[in-house]
Amino acid sequence: MATDIATKELHKPVDVAEYLFRRLYEVGVRAVHGVPGDYNLAALDYLPKCGLHWVGNCNELNAGYAADGYARINGISALVTTFGVGELSALNAIAGAYSEFVPIVHIVGQPHTRSQRDGMLLHHTLGNGDFNVFAKMSGGISCAMGRLNETHEVATLIDNAIRECWLRSRPVYIGLPTDIIVKKIEGQRLDTPLDLSLPPNDPEKEDYVVDVVLKYLHAAKNPVILVDACAIRHRVLDEVHDLMETSGLPTFVAPMGKGAVDETRKNYGGVYAGTGSNPGVREQVESSDLILSIGAIKSDFNTTGFSYRIGQLNTIDFHSTYVRVRYSEYPDINMKGVLRKVVQRMGHVNALPVQRLSNALPDNEKGSSSQEITHAWLWPIVGQWLKERDIVITETGTANFGIWDTRFPANVTAISQVLWGSIGYSVGACQGAALAAKEQNNRRTVLFVGDGSLQLTVQEISTMIRNNLNPIVFVICNQGYTIERFIHGWDEAYNDIQPWDIKGLPVVFGAKDKYKGYRVKTRDELTKLFANDEFNSVPCLQLVELHMPRDDAPASLKLTAESAAHRNA
C-alpha cells in the first residue's frame, strides 16, 4: 500500500497527535484544558504518553478562561475542543486572549477529511456541507491557522502555529481531523527544538532608534517610566527592571501592567490611570517632560475612561513591532533589543525622587470605628496580608479597580481582564493559574470575584476540586452587578441576582471534607482570618464570603462607570 511505502521512508515515524503534543510539552505545556467530544477523543489518548495532564473542564468557555489563566503563569497553554459546538463555545475566551495578548494553542477535533470533502450531513454542522465556516470564525481572533488536512504539511503547520503563538503572544488555531490523528509523519524533526527566539532588529536601524531615545532622555528634566500589559506579554520584564534599576527613574504601572515591576523598589510610584490615579501619582506623571511608555494599551478601563493627560510630544512608546518617539514612528523594531541597548548606553539621567506608597489605610479610615468592610479599607489591608510570589486574580468590576490601591510584595503576579472585560472570566482563570502555580512549587493563588460574576462560571470550582487545587477564593457579596449599577439602572432588576449559599457550594461539587468555607461580615472577622496560620497555609480550597455594602465601590470604578455611561448615552 502507498501508505506503507510512505511510512517506510520515514526515519522516525510518529503519529500526528503525538508530534503535536510532544511539541507542546517542549515549549512548557504540562496540562491541557478542554472538554472531550467525539472528534477529539482519539487525540486525547496520546496525552499521557506525551507527559501531559488532562484537566477536564465543565464547559468550553470555562476551559478557555482556564487556558488563559494557565498561559499567564506558564507562558503558553493548550485548549482542546470539538468541531462546531465545542469550538464556538470557547470563542469568547479565545477572543479575550487575543485582545489581551495571551498565547493559547486551540486544537479543534474535526470530522474525517473524507467526510469534509464529500460535504456529508454530519452532527455538529450547519447541515449545508460547509466544514470551513467555524474555522473562519476563529480566523479573526487567531494569529495563525493550521488546518491539518494534508499529511505532508502537518509538521510544518504545527511548528509554525506554536512558534507564532509564542512570538506574537496570541491564540492560534489547529484543526485536527479524526483520520489525521493517527497518520505517520517524520518524527526526526522533534530532535530539533523549535526556534522561539525573536528575529533580531536591523542593527543600524536599532542603533539609530536607541540614539534618538537617549537624546531625549538625557535632555529631560523629570522623565518617568510607565509600564503596561504588553511589557508582560512580550516578555521584556527583565529589560524593564534593568531600566528601572539603572536609571532610578520614577516608575509607574497602568492597571493592566499591575504586577509587572517589583513594587517594593524605592522608585516604584504606583498605578497611573488618569483621573483614577492617586493625586500624587497623577501629578508626577502628568507633569513629566518625558514618559518612557512600555507596552501601552490605552483602553477605556485602563485609563479611567480615556482620562490620560499626557501628550505624545512628551512620550516615547515602546512596542513589540515598533517604537514611536514623540510623533516619529519607527516600524519593524522590537522593543526588547532597543530597551537592552538603552540600558547599556544610558549614562546619567535626571531621576527625581518618588513619593513612596504603602498599604497604610487612608486618613478617613484610620480612626474609624465602623465594622463595615468598605473598598477604601479592604484593599490596603489585602496588601498587608499578601505574600511574596502570590498570584492575585481580580474579576471585572469592583475588584479590578480596587486592586489599584494595593501595593504588592515582591514577585506577585496580577491577573485581570481589563480590556476584554468578560464577567466570570476570573473563576476559570483562577483554575488555570492555580494549576500552573502547582507546577511551580505551589505558589499561593488568590481570587477576588463578585457574587454576580461567580454565577456565570461557578462550575470551575468543581474542576479545582477535581485537580486538587487549593486557591483562596474571596467572593465579594454585594447583591449583584455593582459596576453595571454605576453605569445604568441602579435599582433595576436586571442588575440583581439570586442570592446563593456560596460557602456551601463546594459540597455540591463533591468536595466533602476537601475545602473550608467562611462567611465574613466585619472588619474584625477579616482581620482575624488574615492572621490565621492554617488559613494562610492554604491546606485546601478555601471559599470566603466577603459581605460588603451594595452601594460601595472604589473611586476609580465610579469615575470609569460615569465615563462609560456618558459614551453610551
From Swiss-Prot:
Cellular-component GO terms for this entry: cytosol; nucleus
Catalytic activity: a 2-oxocarboxylate + H(+) = an aldehyde + CO2; pyruvate + H(+) = acetaldehyde + CO2
GO BP annotations listed: aromatic amino acid family catabolic process to alcohol via Ehrlich pathway
Gene3D superfamilies, per the entry: 3.40.50.970, TPP-binding domain
The record's free-text note on cofactor binding: Binds 1 Mg(2+) per subunit.
Cofactor(s), names only, from the UniProt record: Mg(2+); thiamine diphosphate
Residues the record lists as binding thiamine diphosphate: 398, 421-423, 452-453, 478-483
One function term, GO molecular function aspect: pyruvate decarboxylase activity
Residues binding Mg(2+): 451, 478, 480
Keywords annotated in UniProt: Decarboxylase, Lyase, Magnesium, Metal-binding, Thiamine pyrophosphate
UniProt-listed Pfam families: TPP_enzyme_C, TPP_enzyme_M, TPP_enzyme_N
Binding-site positions, pyruvate: 38, 124, 484
Known EC number: 4.1.1.1
Family assignment from sequence similarity: Belongs to the TPP enzyme family.
Quaternary structure and partners: Homotetramer.
Name of this chain's protein: Pyruvate decarboxylase
Species name: Aspergillus terreus (strain NIH 2624 / FGSC A1156)
